[in-house]
């Protein structure tokens, strides 16, 4: 199979109506914080048990087309010895991999950050592909204030995202490009929109320079929302209007799918906002989800680190996946939360 055919086959498998992505690629420190909320120690065995629980959830493939894994998970096995990526594949869920190595302060740019991981990336992507990964993810983050992010941070992160995407496509691995405008702070929805617009323009300029094929990549942006400390929190219809209006002006129609991150929203908020977007007309791309905490928070609370709670946790995950699947079609209703 040619590289182009390989990339297209992965896009076709990921971009499906009513399905989204499960982001299970938390770094060591992040998953330790999540486990702390349920008083569970972040050991290798507990992480393996948790991710095995997620990927073995019966029926998950009806609403989830792909899962983003952390490097550790590629080599882990379920209790019966099945490699965890294979658990996903059994439900036609495509395994993917987070390939960046985290963020550091950007030199000479106080308050801004830059993502690392380009050194040796081509070699790592080839290895991950041999382990079963068919797509990858790289996250850039942008802190927001009256003066942040700087132009330097916007351009430096766009360049890194584009270089990563080009390296992945050369290897036959679909890149997910994730520019996250952070929800931290008290900025307005208008400020978020202005920053997101500048960020996405820079990202697509860089993708063009690096000859990234837009038809063979996916975008994972944040929604246009105010900072979580802002006094006025908008209704889903306002978030949807602001987000889709901005995307129409920036994201080329060749991009096959936009998979939103939840970025600190509650599970219910993330679902309602996605649903509101899918009720709007004039969307050339599929609008879906790539949620981490917004999918995992309810099952994590149900699990509590206890094997006896696995079934309850899996039912909680399946419910959130089902509700987000409905939101992908513009058919979600808050009453569905209460009926569950």
Where are these regions (language model features)?
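Hydrophobic residues within beta-strands of alpha/beta enzymes
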Residues: 67, 136, 175-176, 217, ...
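Residues that line or immediately flank small-molecule/substrate-binding pockets and catalytic motifs
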Residues: 71, 140, 221
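Helix-rich catalytic cores of soluble enzyme domains
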Residues: 121-206
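Proline-centered loop/turn at the N-terminus of a beta-strand
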Residues: 94, 174, 216-218, 257
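Alpha/beta catalytic barrel-like cores
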Residues: 1-131, 144, 232, 236, ...
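Short, histidine-centered active-site or binding-site loop motifs used for metal coordination
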Residues: 101, 142, 181, 223-225
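Catalytic core of soluble alpha/beta enzymes
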Residues: 183-254
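Conserved, mostly hydrophobic/aromatic
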Residues: 43, 138, 177, 219, ...
């Amino acid at each position: 199979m040619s590289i182009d055919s390989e990339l297209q086959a992965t896009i076709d498998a990921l971009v499906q109506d009513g399905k989204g992505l499960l982001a299970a690629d938390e770094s060591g420190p992040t998953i330790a914080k999540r486990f702390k909320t349920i008083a569970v120690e972040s050991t290798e065995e507990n992480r393996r048990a948790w991710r095995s629980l997620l990927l073995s959830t019966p029926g998950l493939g009806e609403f989830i087309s792909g899962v983003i894994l952390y490097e550790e998970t590629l080599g882990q096995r379920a209790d019966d010895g099945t490699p965890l990526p294979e658990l996903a594949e059994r439900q036609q869920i495509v395994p993917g991999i987070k390939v960046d190595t985290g963020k550091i302060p950007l030199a000479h740019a106080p308050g801004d950050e830059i993502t690392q991981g380009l050194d040796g990336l081509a070699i790592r992507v080839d290895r991950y592909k041999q382990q079963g990964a068919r797509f990858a993810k790289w996250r850039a983050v942008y802190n927001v204030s009256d003066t942040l992010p700087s132009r330097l941070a916007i351009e430096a992160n766009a360049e890194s995202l584009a270089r990563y995407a080009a390296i992945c496509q050369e290897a036959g691995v679909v890149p997910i490009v994730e520019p996250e405008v952070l929800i931290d702070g008290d900025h307005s929805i208008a400020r978020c929109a202005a920053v997101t617009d500048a960020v996405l323009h820079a990202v697509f300029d860089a993708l063009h320079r690096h000859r990234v094929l837009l038809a063979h990549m996916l975008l994972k942006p944040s929604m246009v929302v105010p900072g979580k400390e802002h006094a006025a929190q908008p209704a889903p219809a306002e978030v949807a209007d602001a987000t889709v209006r901005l995307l129409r002006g920036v994201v080329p129609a060749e991009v096959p799918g936009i998979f939103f991150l939840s970025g600190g929203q509650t599970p219910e908020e993330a679902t309602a906002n996605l649903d509101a977007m899918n009720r709007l007309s004039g969307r050339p791309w599929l609008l879906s989800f790539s949620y981490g905490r917004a999918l995992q928070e309810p099952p994590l609370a149900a699990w509590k680190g206890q094997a006896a709670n696995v079934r309850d946790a899996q039912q909680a995950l399946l419910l959130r996946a089902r509700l987000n699947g409905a939101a992908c079609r513009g058919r979600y209703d808050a009453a569905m939360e209460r009926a569950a």
